[in-house]
Amino acid sequence: MKRLLLLFLFFITFSSAFPLVRMTENEENMQLAQAYLNQFYSLEIEGNHLVQSKNRSLIDDKIREMQAFFGLTVTGKLDSNTLEIMKTPRCGVPDVGQYGYTLPGWRKYNLTYRIINYTPDMARAAVDEAIQEGLEVWSKVTPLKFTKISKGIADIMIAFRTRVHGRCPRYFDGPLGVLGHAFPPGPGLGGDTHFDEDENWTKDGAGFNLFLVAAHEFGHALGLSHSNDQTALMFPNYVSLDPRKYPLSQDDINGIQSIYGGLPKEPAKPKEPTIPHACDPDLTFDAITTFRREVMFFKGRHLWRIYYDITDVEFELIASFWPSLPADLQAAYENPRDKILVFKDENFWMIRGYAVLPDYPKSIHTLGFPGRVKKIDAAVCDKTTRKTYFFVGIWCWRFDEMTQTMDKGFPQRVVKHFPGISIRVDAAFQYKGFFFFSRGSKQFEYDIKTKNITRIMRTNTWFQCKEPKNSSFGFDINKEKAHSGGIKILYHKSLSLFIFGIVHLLKNTSIYQ
């Protein structure tokens, strides 16, 4: 009997422990949220006062403000997407308050900087290089010039610090969390830039890239606030990118030039039209889409067309098919009704065969995108589910082609919905059940059922080039015949149009027989 009583008491104790663990986790999440909102959104609630209804209402309002800034679904609730953003390493400068606006800049163009101490994570020369290149990001688009000094007081004093440090009113929090902070132009701490020494700083390996973080913090030291443009350098969260190919977004350029102006204008040199080469090892695509039994690859003013299971590749001007379409398209996809949608900036066009449908272009916001979305990076329609994924920076939206509405619960981070695809997507399409994501000159074959990358290849693998050729390879603008792996690239518009017509005539005839 005693054994039964002991077992019963053990069972009651063991089973009652689970709700306590869950409650503790919820409390920890709420405390994390309170600290985050205090630091970055001026919540100004001290201590553990979350149970008060007034304070909880303030927290909900600040969560809504934070969700709106990061492009999340605005609910005021501490959902998983909101927590994920709060736990992402970021800059220590607030997103609102006096730092939520672009501040007055320096009253001079020639600025000095000094590195007070160095991180042991990197060679001194590598730190010098990262700092110099971080400043050059801004001097390349403004009249600003930066000079390094080794003694005395510089306009921008740079240091690696930990936790509470010196007279600085901001502090660091150990590994992860806050990576750095900087102060806007002015006397005293103005322009000073600090990096958290508890982080693992790196040039190109595992850890946090010093150049990327420094370039961001120097934006603050020059007077910029945070941007909610997810492609901007001044976006508050750390995004791992290839530093060698890192461009400032137009939002960054507009912001810094609103303070200091642009570079002196030089006489514009007439540009010769560039023609992309299929076997260029650095070839990238603006957009890719299927069209019935074809795949179309868009680049500048041109497109390549390949047919399923046929080795011929055709190369044409976009205008030879659709004269009213602009060049430099940014995204394209085929919907379940055999129509192509192509996107550039805030507009999209719908194509049926050789015809651009009337009443186009239309605004992308008619599809359900919020006003902050200014362009689409890539799009792909899953033929099985009839759902279209739109990629915008590090986020993706999902559109229901049957109801013509955006799905609830989106946007989501790309890496969350497509594990392994961690940063922005340049182009995407579906072929034989797989998604193909292009980023730069690489393409990732992705199994959407197992959510795994199954193959990594060059973007021009589809053209079966035997060996990459130099991108400066010369060829006739009117006609190029390149024999690579049995592929013949045709430039004659009349012949390509004839083939296109015959293929689709045979297809349509077979369907209705």
Swiss-Prot record:
Similarity comment: family membership: Belongs to the peptidase M10A family.
SUPFAM superfamilies reported for this sequence: Hemopexin-like domain (SSF50923), Metalloproteases ('zincins'), catalytic domain (SSF55486), PGBD-like (SSF47090)
Segments of this protein annotated with the region Required for retention in the endoplasmic reticulum: 466-513
Residues forming the catalytic site: 217
Binding annotation for Ca(2+) 4: 286, 377, 426
Cofactor note text: Binds 4 Ca(2+) ions per subunit.
Record function comment: Matrix metalloproteinases degrade protein components of the extracellular matrix such as fibronectin, laminin, gelatins and/or collagens.
Gene name, Swiss-Prot/TrEMBL: MMP27
Name recorded for this polypeptide: Matrix metalloproteinase-27
Binding positions (Zn(2+) 1): 165, 181, 194
Consequence when changing residue 452 to Q: Loss of N-glycosylation
Binding site for Ca(2+) 1: 121, 199
